[in-house]
């Protein structure tokens, strides 16, 4: 039907006849000559209809926006002064000699333009229209380029692409599973995989040596801007490599990816930082290194002061007291500070103390703060020295349980960096290493795995049992501009160590056999040392395309309430289907107020 795509028409085709198919992007009638901007995936080309060709000219008078047409015509140079430097085809046009309307279109619900603001629910309801917009076409093209490059890189390095099952078994991995009832096995359920974690470990035991997969994963969890109930991972596993070797290979892949697709150079090697250092300096295990603000611990300076807001957390083994200097922040008004106080309150902070440094040379007289009267001069001077404060700066304080301080002050650091224009340009990758093996869950009163229960510890089995709270894991996360784009670890490859970890997590031998017996059995048959990681493909494309959400780089995403406006899913099923599956609903949701909530 066509000889070329619209975006491929250029000066190399001057004088040639071409056949084009696409959508009418814009139609203009200028003094008896009709101009149509014809659009397809590759771009736009201007098509001219003049009265010298009466049949196509007459038909062109009837075409409207988003009609699908086929044009045959001759490529010619645009008249001097009418060139469009913004188009690849901007120096030429096609003089139409034939026109066929392949399909008509109703008026679209919104313009097919990249810079038009449209309600997100409307965009998702008419996603097939939204995906026609040039910006969405560019994102899908970049996603294709990224996926193709990653596959080629891994193929070149001896990895096999192997598919793993979608219908699997429910296992505790930190989020709720999507369950699928089995018709052939009554009262039993499959689960959709949260990741191929166990299957890829079994592939290493199978001797596959190096595996990867571009795979859909499913998690039934509360959604945030960077989460979806179904998402895509680049899943990787390899045998006989330690963490340094895995990290070196993976950062080479990401470095080559940025060079190939964005013409951007990333550092070689990527910097590395321990989890403890990241939390100490940035109150985050995925710090954005483009923001030049750091937290400073001052608990030792607060020991013994009468100001209980600081003294209490300073004396608490689980507490933390920090200072965060904002250079030039002395110009913030009281209203600005009140707004920031409400912001940190979202994360559990009970307030936001501060000191303005109006004139460092004037001593205490040059400082402004309601908390100065509660602290001795030596403490104040110690804070000024440790934060290296200068005239015009503003120092914020966080004091509470370490978790609350980290969450609130870490978020404040990012907000101040963004609001004050402090975020540096460029790409700042980072490896975060030496994560704790476990964290204590107050609600359940037990240890939980910080990553997953198959991560290998750095210590011996005996040391792990003696002090699980101090054990570090062989885990590593790749962070880019404050977003975790990949995470992995060296895995446990001995049955005894795996059972020890299960014991510490409160998973007894009987429960472990019931849920993970297949893995424990496989570990007994010559399991090699192995490790790997998974990259969030959606997040990676989001960052590289400059999109604000992973929904912007997925063809058919769900809303933040896990609903698809396009096909109205999830939806009810009829009684016959439920009966066949042996399921009976206790209540009828239709009677109780409808089916799916809107966003």
UniProtKB/Swiss-Prot annotation:
UniProt-listed SUPFAM superfamilies: Class II aaRS and biotin synthetases, GAD domain-like, Nucleic acid-binding proteins
Q: Which InterPro entries match?
A: Aa-tRNA-synt_II, aa-tRNA-synth_II, aa-tRNA-synth_II/BPL/LPL, Asp-tRNA-ligase_1, Asp-tRNA-ligase_1_N, Asp/Asn-tRNA-synth_IIb, AspRS_core, GAD-like_sf
What Gene Ontology terms for biological process does this UniProt record contain?
Answer: aspartyl-tRNA aminoacylation
Known Pfam families for this protein? GAD, tRNA-synt_2, tRNA_anti-codon
Alphabetized UniProt keyword annotations:
Aminoacyl-tRNA synthetase, ATP-binding, Cytoplasm, Ligase, Nucleotide-binding, Protein biosynthesis
Q: Where does it live in the cell?
A: Cytoplasm
Q: Which GO terms describe its molecular function?
A: aspartate-tRNA ligase activity; aspartate-tRNA(Asn) ligase activity; ATP binding; nucleic acid binding
Record-marked site positions (Important for tRNA non-discrimination): 30, 81
Q: What is its EC number?
A: 6.1.1.23
Instruction: List, alphabetically, the PROSITE patterns matched.
Output: AA_TRNA_LIGASE_II
Region named Aspartate:
197-200
User: Which cellular component, as a GO term, is one annotated location?
Assistant: cytoplasm
Q: Detail which positions bind ATP.
A: 219-221, 228, 484, 536-539
Which class of enzymes does this protein belong to? ligase
Q: Which PANTHER family match?
A: ASPARTATE--TRNA LIGASE, MITOCHONDRIAL, ASPARTYL/LYSYL-TRNA SYNTHETASE
**What is the protein's known function?**
Aspartyl-tRNA synthetase with relaxed tRNA specificity since it is able to aspartylate not only its cognate tRNA(Asp) but also tRNA(Asn). Reaction proceeds in two steps: L-aspartate is first activated by ATP to form Asp-AMP and then transferred to the acceptor end of tRNA(Asp/Asn).
Task: Give the similarity note.
Answer: Belongs to the class-II aminoacyl-tRNA synthetase family. Type 1 subfamily.
Under the heading HAMAP family, the entry gives:
Asp_tRNA_synth_type1
Record note on quaternary structure: Homodimer.
The name on file for this protein is Aspartate--tRNA(Asp/Asn) ligase
| Organism whose genome encodes this protein | Methylococcus capsulatus (strain ATCC 33009 / NCIMB 11132 / Bath)
Q: What is the gene name?
A: aspS
